[in-house]
């Protein structure tokens, strides 16, 4: 389990006891202020990123990879945050700012083997695929689209249409999705 220094102190630990547990191998330092309570714990970077930036949502190529919609391993973690959020200053993160009116639409906590990540559901990712079509390499766009076609029975089209109503260009997106799927 990943826990912060603040979380450890809330559990009654002191800075001294934290250092002692690190020395004894009972805690493992992941990054400044973040620890693993199981020294042998193996977790994905997505899980750590979700824990470190709880208000950010894993989206885009990172989310497509998590869902197995593409075999392309993203170079960066693609995170969505609300407009006017503080910038995430990490070399391995690409941050996109989204309008608060649709930022939370379709957010779920997805269980992975390594832990839980905050991402979008399939319906919202399908919208993101078409909404940001020009930002993805053509080969990856068509690979993800092909994957969506294979799992179209898992997509809740009623929910998809409800989501599309929140976007200003929802009708044109709906038409494009309907033609493609």
Predicted regions and their residues:
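A short, conserved structural fragment
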Residues: 25-31
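Nucleic-acid-binding surface
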Residues: 3-6, 13, 17, 22, ...
């Amino acid at each position: 389990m990943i826990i912060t220094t603040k979380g450890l102190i809330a559990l009654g630990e002191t800075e001294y006891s934290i250092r002692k547990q690190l020395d004894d191998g009972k805690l493992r330092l992941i990054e400044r202020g973040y620890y693993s309570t199981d020294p042998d714990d193996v977790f994905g970077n997505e899980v750590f990123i979700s824990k470190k930036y709880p208000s950010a949502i894993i989206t885009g190529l990172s989310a497509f990879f998590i869902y197995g919609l593409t075999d392309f391993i993203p170079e960066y973690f693609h995170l969505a945050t609300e407009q006017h959020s503080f910038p995430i200053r990490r070399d391995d993160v690409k941050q996109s700012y989204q309008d608060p009116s649709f930022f939370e639409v379709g957010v779920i906590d997805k269980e992975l083997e390594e832990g839980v990540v905050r991402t979008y559901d399939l319906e919202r990712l399908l919208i993101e695929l078409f909404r940001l079509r020009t930002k993805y390499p053509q080969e990856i766009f068509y690979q993800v689209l092909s994957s969506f076609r294979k799992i179209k029975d898992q997509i809740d089209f009623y929910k998809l249409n409800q989501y599309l109503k929140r976007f200003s260009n929802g009708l044109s997106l709906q038409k494009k999705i309907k033609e493609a799927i």
